[in-house]
Amino acid sequence: MVEVKKMTTQVQHTQEERLLAALAHAAIVTGAMAPVAGILIYLTQKEKSAYATGQALQAAVYQLLGLLVMIVIWSCWGGFYALTFIPIIRNSDQYQDAPPPIFWVGMGSMIIPLIVMGLWGLYGLYGALRAWAGADFRYAVVGRLVTEKFTDF
């Protein structure tokens, strides 16, 4: 049996570059302010570090997309939840003791946006860990788009 060793040339990034890249990804825990960190790191490092710049820009785009997705999902959930009040309003005498079953479906469906938010955030934190390790991390959602549009890093 012949063993083939895979040769890779991995660029060693400085600790500062890795820290800035990881911070850009980890900023996802700050919520709506997350893209600001990525944009600030991108703007301050674009002349200094291609690695930190690329990771920060990618993180900012991912976080902005996440904000848009969350706005849409929470708006849809809010609309659905508001619709569950129609039976209560129309038949207030019937539902004095307990809300209709559709109300509980609306409450239970709140888990969907929470799961999406949690997974989105965990993926961002995974990106932070990979960036801290010095890996050339690419988000599955926006990684290729960012690298194609901004090929200078």
Model-derived features: positions:
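Membrane-interface extramembranous regions at the lipid-water interface
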Residues: 2-31, 35-64, 129-153
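Long, highly hydrophobic alpha-helical transmembrane signal-anchor segments
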Residues: 2-12, 88-101
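Hydrophobic alpha-helical transmembrane segments in multi-pass membrane proteins
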Residues: 20-38, 59-91, 102-127
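Charge-rich, acidic-biased intrinsically disordered regions
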Residues: 80-94, 141-151
